[in-house]
Amino acid sequence: ADANKVWPTGLTVAEAEELHTYVTNGFRVFVGIAVVAHVLVFAAHPWGRGGALVA
């Protein structure tokens, strides 16, 4: 067993940190796209205060 590898992934600390940056950046892109999508939907069909989705 390699002492530099971290259980349970088998990645080194440096590899894990690199992977974490990719995952974090991917999440940021996902959230950004979701925010833009929500703004566009709200602009087309406002919700709340008597909107179509509120009884």
Swiss-Prot record:
Cytoplasmic side, ranges: 1-21
GO cellular component entries: plasma membrane; plasma membrane light-harvesting complex
A biological process term (GO) from this entry: photosynthesis, light reaction
Membrane topology: Single-pass type II membrane protein
Pfam families, per the entry: LHC
Periplasmic face residues: 45-55
GO molecular function: bacteriochlorophyll binding; electron transporter, transferring electrons within the cyclic electron transport pathway of photosynthesis activity; metal ion binding
Residues that span the membrane, as ranges: 22-44
The keyword Ubl conjugation is annotated on this UniProt entry: no
Keywords in alphabetical order: Antenna complex, Bacteriochlorophyll, Cell inner membrane, Cell membrane, Chlorophyll, Chromophore, Light-harvesting polypeptide, Magnesium, Membrane, Metal-binding, Transmembrane, Transmembrane helix
Binding of a bacteriochlorophyll, residues: 38
InterPro entries referenced in this protein's UniProt entry, alphabetically: Antenna_a/b, Antenna_beta_CS, Antenna_beta_dom_sf, LHB-1/5, Light-harvesting_complex
Covalent S-S links between cysteines: none
Annotated compartments: Cell inner membrane
Job description of the protein: Antenna complexes are light-harvesting systems, which transfer the excitation energy to the reaction centers.
Subunit description: The core complex is formed by different alpha and beta chains, binding bacteriochlorophyll molecules, and arranged most probably in tetrameric structures disposed around the reaction center. The non-pigmented gamma chains may constitute additional components.
Family per similarity comment: Belongs to the antenna complex beta subunit family.
Name of the protein this chain belongs to: Light-harvesting polypeptide B-800/860 beta chain
Species lineage: Bacteria, Pseudomonadati, Pseudomonadota, Betaproteobacteria, Rhodocyclales
